[in-house]
Design a protein with these regions (language model features):
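Sec-dependent N-terminal signal peptides
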Residues: 14-20
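N-terminal secretory signal peptides that target proteins for export/translocation
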Residues: 1-13
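Extracellular, beta-strand-rich glycan-interacting domains
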Residues: 470
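Formylglycine-dependent sulfatase
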Residues: 13, 29-454, 459-461, 473-493, ...
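Hydrophobic h-region of N-terminal signal peptides that target proteins for export
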Residues: 20-29
Length: 518
């Protein structure tokens, strides 16, 4: 054989072997990566956790926490990095979830509004490379259980082709077809449906399940089965990424049809002044009696979360699993004299739980990191070693280095978080929303909360400004005080810089320049 022939064949073997070796290398790397379990009940405020008043956490938040019972979260907190200042920038279910999944703000994520059948402009489309896409491509088995609520409902019922999944109430619920699932290969989910003891779900193949069981417990049971792989739900040779989206403590919270009776009994006989303890709570509001059911739902969610933690221990996966407990947004629950539980810049609405445990890697502590919704995806990808696979269009920041080492200088700590409120814009002849109205923008720093609201003709309507350090319950709007004009201008300038960076309409359409204080 000539040398040229020999080297030619050697080159051919190399060309064949290289991709094979690459596959083996990728598989080996994936097997070494940690599992991820991400649990996020809806509408649970940061103050609705018992441990804030316990030794080691007292004084970490500068206002009174709720008198709730959360024994599992309490134990988990002692093993976790607990953020005191995580923010839901657009504190509504769908916009937050859009940011969570894509790492982008609502103006870019495709989900600027709460998803329903009148808002085709707000939906998690197949285009953006999402968190689960990256995880799946990196060799993860990906599972989604529970509430999704990021898609525009269409007439795509698997059981009744050409019909909505809820023909009597077609506005909200949605079925997610397989091609829209962004890498999730295990599926037990629905859009949004607020009958907590009468939930329904669609599985991988579009089969509908109606378990007639309080939804967080049902979801936790299936999360446990997925973790233990009882029915071959996942590929055991791969690390797994599991998201569990629980609906409670989201409303309704009016009766025992909304929560577990055993949890309600913990609060049933307590007077309102022992439950609504925050200094900005109005116990005369009609909603006040709901607090017992809301707290009962929080305690029930805690029990469901405990089931998931127990399964990880049983499976011996505690040490190699990153576990997050957080929420979409908060709940005002009679604070600020508003019936709207969310969508406002108040701390009860924006400030959400964010607890993350990664044994042997993250030192348990509290941290005041101003984490924003779009930061979660890149940060979590960073923690599993996928820094280089964060999509280039991601607007959030990878803060994984700060979770691993709070003194790290790899990335600058954020000094502010945006507040975003969008509303329906123009509608077509069929009543479908064709654009959104950017009703308010604001900024939250470690000391101040500011929000600027506009009218439909793009004039300044109102400015809110709170000194959260000296007025933690945000009882006094100090925006009209002449001595605070300079402060408002400074905060507005900082907000404008961020809005320009993310190409928000308040920057691109010149709205902020028009309504800012001169």
């Amino acid at each position: 054989m000539s040398n040229s022939s020999f080297f030619s064949k050697l080159s051919m073997l190399k060309n064949v072997a290289t991709p094979i070796l690459s596959v083996f290398a990728t598989t080996a790397a994936a097997q070494q990566r940690p599992n991820v379990v991400y649990v996020f009940p809806d509408q649970m405020r940061n103050y609705a956790m018992e441990f804030w008043s316990q030794p080691g956490f007292e004084g970490s938040v500068n206002s009174q926490n709720d008198p709730v019972h959360t024994p599992n979260i309490n134990r988990f907190a002692r093993e976790s990095v607990v953020l005191t200042s995580a923010q839901s920038n657009c504190p509504l279910s769908s916009p937050h979830r859009g940011s969570l999944l894509t790492g982008m703000y609502p103006n870019k994520s495709g989900v600027p509004l709460n998803c329903n059948s009148s808002r085709p402009i707000s939906s998690w489309l197949t285009d953006p490379v999402s968190w689960s896409d990256v995880m799946s491509q990196a060799g993860y088995d990906c599972g989604y259980i529970g509430k999704l609520h990021v898609q525009f409902p269409t007439k795509n019922s698997p059981q009744n082709p050409g019909e909505y999944v809820e023909t009597q109430r077609p506005v909200w619920d949605a079925y997610t077809e397989p091609q829209q699932r962004h890498g999730f290969n295990y599926w037990l989910s629905y859009g949004t449906f607020d009958e907590h003891k009468n939930p329904h779900y669609w599985d991988n193949n579009g089969n509908r399940h109606d378990p007639h069981e309080w939804s967080p417990i049902y979801e936790a049971k299936h999360a446990v089965s997925y973790i233990l792989n009882r029915n071959g739900e996942r590929d055991s040779s791969k690390p797994f990424f599991l998201m569990v989206g629980m609906n409670p403590p989201h409303s309704p919270y009016r009766s025992l049809t909304d929560c577990m009776e055993e949890d309600y009994n913990l609060y049933a006989k307590q007077p309102l002044d022992q439950l609504l303890v925050r200094k900005n709570a109005n116990r005369e509001m009609r909603k006040a009696e709901s607090v017992r059911y809301y707290f009962a739902s929080v305690t029930g969610v805690d029990r469901a979360f405990g089931m998931i933690l127990d399964a990880l221990r049983e499976a011996g996966l505690d040490d190699n699993t990153i576990v997050v407990f957080t929420s979409d947004h908060g709940e005002t629950m009679c604070s600020q004299n508003t019936d709207d539980p969310k969508n406002s810049p108040y701390s009860e609405s924006m400030n959400v739980p964010f607890l993350i445990r990664y044994k042997g890697h993250l030192t348990p502590r509290t941290d005041n990191l101003l984490l924003s919704s779009p930061d979660i995806m890149p940060t979590m990808l960073g923690l599993v070693g996928l820094h280089d696979q964060i999509p280039s269009v991601t607007q959030g920041v990878d803060y994984s280095s700060l979770f691993l080492d709070p003194t790290s200088k790899t990335v600058e700590r954020p000094d502010a978080a945006l507040y975003i409120q969008n509303m329906d814009g123009d509608k077509d002849k069929d009543g479908l929303v064709v654009n959104y109205f950017p009703a308010a923008r604001g900024l939250k720093t470690h000391r101040y909360t500011m929000a600027i609201y506009i009218t439909r003709d793009y004039k300044r309507k109102e400015i809110l400004l709170f000194d959260d350090q000296n007025d933690p319950y945000q009882l006094n709007n100090i925006a009209d005080k002449p001595e605070n004009r300079k402060l408002i201008k400074q905060l507005t300038k900082r907000m404008g810089k961020i809005l320009k960076e993310i190409e928000d309409p308040w920057a691109t359409e010149g709205i902020l320049a028009k309504v800012a204080l001169k």
